[in-house]
Amino acid sequence: MFVDEAKIRVKAGNGGNGIVAFRREKFVPRGGPWGGDGGRGGDVIMESSERHNTLVHFRFNPEYKAERGRHGEGANKTGREGVDVLLKVPVGTLVYDDETGELLHEFVHPDERIIIARGGRGGRGNAQFATPTHQAPRESEDGKIGDEKFLRLELKLLADVGLVGYPNAGKSTLISRISSARPKIADYPFTTLQPNLGVVVVGEMPHEQSYVVADIPGLIEGASLGAGLGMQFLRHVERTRLIAHLVDVSDASGRPDPVQDYKVITKELASFGSGIEKKPTIIVATKIDVANPDKLKKLTTFAKRSKKAFFAISAVTGEGIEPLKWEMAKRVEAIRAKAQDPVEEADEIEAPKKKRRAPARKSVR
């Protein structure tokens, strides 16, 4: 389980002011009060979305403000309501009041929608103050102040892609090339002592795609029985949507057969007993800048016979990196589209169903 966090400030719109106005038209003597009410301020709304999987956007854009309501007008016209702001968050996001630490909401299911900061009520115009004994009121109300909150968002991330393979297969180097993650990298086994997380972005706005990659610490023969760094890391693989199985085809590994390397790790995944080995898999030959040609050819042939997607890359030179990034993006998107329930694990307390409001007119993704 990985944790992403962001702190934001949200400000709902203030209500518009009511106004003082009187009806002055020909042939309408003593027209009376005609001042309209102010419009309601816009709300700040949060909605859970399957198409979002990190909080990275909120870290770079920490402030959100809804539009204030317009002031009332003559002819007893109510001011226009302020435009709501819609913030889309990943399923699994927890929303805390950053000042009190109170948990305000947990988004457990897709398409949950809550008002996190409510807009201020519009003030009353003088027409609202008219009575039989007070027929020309000159008082009105200002709009109410909209809610302002400082929030802490926390997301327990489930990786879309798990990078697996023997220690030193190049997983940490790859994740450092395709994302902003900076894991410890050195030329010895078990450099990675805990899963590293990276967010990969492909394409450009407004059509960019993102997915989460986990650099799972190196597995070895017997991992399913606790060997090496043990079963704890197999649990992380279990939660991914797609596996990228990295196989070193250089002579640096000291192992003669890359196909056997692939089979050993696949056997460990199968021995874990939760169907991990059945997940969609891409075979990735690594270190092709210093590849043993015979090893590369053998692994390529095996991948074709196994009808597995196959890519050959060098994280050092960058060869093959871009096609691999796009292939993973395409496959993750297809898996997400097919998923019936993207939340594999929910806490014991389910969020109550919320009443739907009319869709907000301004969306922040």
From Swiss-Prot:
Keywords for the protein's UniProt record, in alphabetical order: Cytoplasm, GTP-binding, Hydrolase, Magnesium, Metal-binding, Nucleotide-binding
OBG-type G domain residues: 159-333
Keyword DNA-binding among record annotations: no
Stretches for region Disordered: 340-365
EC numbers for this chain: 3.6.5.-
Any one of the GO BP annotations: ribosome biogenesis
Localization (cell): Cytoplasm
Cofactor: Mg(2+)
UniProt binding sites for Mg(2+): 172, 192
GO molecular function annotations of the record: GTP binding; GTPase activity; magnesium ion binding
HAMAP family in alphabetical order: GTPase_Obg
InterPro entries documented for this protein: G_OBG, GTP-bd, GTP-bd_Obg/CgtA, GTP1-OBG_CS, GTP1_OBG_dom, GTP1_OBG_dom_sf, OBG_GTPase, P-loop_NTPase
Protein name: GTPase Obg
Assembly behavior: Monomer.
Pfam families reported in the protein's UniProt record: GTP1_OBG (PF01018), MMR_HSR1 (PF01926)
Family: Belongs to the TRAFAC class OBG-HflX-like GTPase superfamily. OBG GTPase family.
Residues given in the record as GTP binding sites: 165-172, 190-194, 215-218, 286-289, 314-316
Top class in the EC scheme: hydrolase
Keyword GTP-binding found: yes
Main location: cytoplasm
One Gene Ontology cellular component: cytoplasm
Role description: An essential GTPase which binds GTP, GDP and possibly (p)ppGpp with moderate affinity, with high nucleotide exchange rates and a fairly low GTP hydrolysis rate. Plays a role in control of the cell cycle, stress response, ribosome biogenesis and in those bacteria that undergo differentiation, in morphogenesis control.
Domain Obg intervals: 1-158
Biased composition (Basic residues): 353-365
